[in-house]
Amino acid sequence: MNAVIVIPARLSSSRLKEKMLADLEGEPLIVRTWQQATKSRLASRVVVATDSERIFAVLREAGAEVVMTSPDLTCGTDRIAEAAEQVGGDVFVNLQGDEPLIDPATIDLAIAPFFGEGPLPDCTTLVFPLKPDERQIIDDPHVVKAVLDTRGNALYFSRSPIPYRRETLPDTKYYRHIGLYAFRADVLKAFVALPPSMLERAESLEQLRLLENGYRIRCIETTTDTPGVNTEEELEEVRRLFRERFGA
């Protein structure tokens, strides 16, 4: 079994201009994310997929493996799939390029089920437990929530607070979805060939395309939260946390 981490890295970004090249203690943000990914124990290879010659150049200088992908791709999963065709592999991990604080052990949580006994998962992802009284987070449409079945497979993902709390129950479980995925190679190829689904378009959540088409997404619980970078304020916070963690 050969697991490959692919990090999609577009130069254009809507909220924070060219964030992949933002400085993080002397290195571009995307280089810091790649450095963390290379510490994974289960992945045999880490590849960055980009549409930018500038990103390509800084990563090659850092020693990373980089592939160029089409600038016309509309989402990170399409970029992962195009890179997968170039590099080959059995399992492909989609790791966001703006997560320089990702714990390598967290990445391995998503990969591990593909190395276990029994049938291989279609896809795995991560969820972070929330407390029922964390209403501000649960009600936030920018925070994607997940509900799971008793085997840990996703029943649904939504920007709405799910499950809806009609009455207070002490055992109600809430999960925040963490957007790291590991795909079986054939599932990734099938996924990007499918048209956007109704629920996907309604929620603006591409993972719903898998669920609507009968694929299972196994959710692994993690207690390690990983901040991303979408605003200048979040970048400053990640810089502070990076200095604390790595002593830069």
UniProtKB/Swiss-Prot annotation:
A GO cellular component annotation here is:
cytosol
- Pfam families, A to Z: CTP_transf_3 (PF02348)
SUPFAM superfamilies per record? Nucleotide-diphospho-sugar transferases
Task: Note the SS bond partners.
Answer: none
GO terms classed as biological process: CMP-keto-3-deoxy-D-manno-octulosonic acid biosynthetic process; lipopolysaccharide biosynthetic process
Q: Which CDD domains match?
A: CMP-KDO-Synthetase
* Keywords per UniProt: Cytoplasm, Lipopolysaccharide biosynthesis, Nucleotidyltransferase, Transferase
Task: Give this protein's Gene Ontology molecular function annotations.
Answer: 3-deoxy-manno-octulosonate cytidylyltransferase activity
Which reaction does this chain catalyze? 3-deoxy-alpha-D-manno-oct-2-ulosonate + CTP = CMP-3-deoxy-beta-D-manno-octulosonate + diphosphate
Record EC number: 2.7.7.38
Source species, domain of life? Bacteria
Q: In which pathway does it act?
A: Nucleotide-sugar biosynthesis; CMP-3-deoxy-D-manno-octulosonate biosynthesis; CMP-3-deoxy-D-manno-octulosonate from 3-deoxy-D-manno-octulosonate and CTP: step 1/1; Bacterial outer membrane biogenesis; lipopolysaccharide biosynthesis
User: Which PANTHER family did the record assign?
Assistant: 3-DEOXY-MANNO-OCTULOSONATE CYTIDYLYLTRANSFERASE (PTHR42866), 3-DEOXY-MANNO-OCTULOSONATE CYTIDYLYLTRANSFERASE, MITOCHONDRIAL (PTHR42866:SF2)
Q: What does this protein do?
A: Activates KDO (a required 8-carbon sugar) for incorporation into bacterial lipopolysaccharide in Gram-negative bacteria.
In its UniProt entry, what is this protein called?
3-deoxy-manno-octulosonate cytidylyltransferase
What taxonomic ancestry is recorded? Bacteria, Pseudomonadati, Chlorobiota, Chlorobiia, Chlorobiales
| Gene coding for it | kdsB
